[in-house]
């Protein structure tokens, strides 16, 4: 029985002294963690350096793009100052009807009352194109109070 105690005590001692004891395992894990952290830091540094150089290249191209954008913005601004009118769409048929009727008489030699609604809409789309290009006379952009509606010469006596 005494020999049984020795063997278990020896086993305990042997376990404590062996490199695979719990304390040694913790130490070796800590060392591995430190080594891993150092390796990670080195990798992160190299990635950051690569990223910075890549970033600087992108930055230079972004500057070029932003410069181009500024040029186009100023160019658009010049266009807006040159053409002080709002762009029209087909939906502005009723709001710009006086201008459209005047344009029909002046440019197409037609009267608004002589047209069918479909023909008037088609001609209005031509008017919108000319308006948006800025090719119309300034009187159209300034606004017209009343436009010629029919070819009939109204003779209203007061």
From Swiss-Prot:
**Keywords carried by this UniProt record:** Auxin signaling pathway, Developmental protein, Nucleus
Q: Which GO terms describe its biological process?
A: auxin-activated signaling pathway; negative regulation of cell division; regulation of auxin mediated signaling pathway; stigma development; style development
UniProt KW Iron-sulfur keyword = no
According to the UniProt record, where is the region Disordered?
Answer: 1-88
Q: Where is the composition biased (Basic residues)?
A: 48-58, 67-81
Q: What are the Basic and acidic residues biased-composition ranges?
A: 1-11, 22-47
In which tissues or organs does this protein occur? Answer: Specifically expressed in flowers pistils, especially in stigmas and styles. Barely detected in roots, stems, leaves, sepals, petals and stamen.
Name the GO cellular-component terms.
Answer: nucleus
Localization (cell): Nucleus
What does the record note as the disruption phenotype of the gene behind this chain?
A: Enlarged stigmas and styles due to increased in cell numbers.
**Which PANTHER family does this entry report, sorted A to Z?**
STYLE CELL-CYCLE INHIBITOR 1
Its annotated function is as follows: Component of the auxin signaling transduction pathway that regulates cell proliferation and differentiation during flowers stigmas and styles development. Involved in the regulation of auxin-related genes.
Name of the protein: Style cell-cycle inhibitor 1-B
